[in-house]
Amino acid sequence: MSTASKVVLGLSIVLTISTVAGVHIKQNWDRQRLREGVVRDLERLERKRENLRALEEQIQLTRELVTERNRRQAEASETH
């Protein structure tokens, strides 16, 4: 086998191994990004649920405040 043939064969092997390794690394990177996306989605859903709970609590507290304010105004108008 000539020297040129050996060089071409060696370069072909190196390029093939590099391509396979590159594809493997990219697939792993893509899988990791997909997993992170799922985790982010779950965290976002949990924040949304927590925000809805806080909103419902604020609505209830506002109702109680309005009821108490109306009751005090009614008591004040009865005493005058």
From Swiss-Prot:
One of its GO terms (cellular component) is mitochondrion. Keywords: Mitochondrion, Transit peptide. GO terms for biological process: mitochondrial cytochrome c oxidase assembly. InterPro entries: Pet117 (IPR031568). Residues 1-22 form a transit peptide. It is found in: Mitochondrion. It holds the Pfam family PET117. Belongs to the PET117 family. This is Protein PET117 homolog, mitochondrial. It comes from Danio rerio (Zebrafish). The gene is pet117.
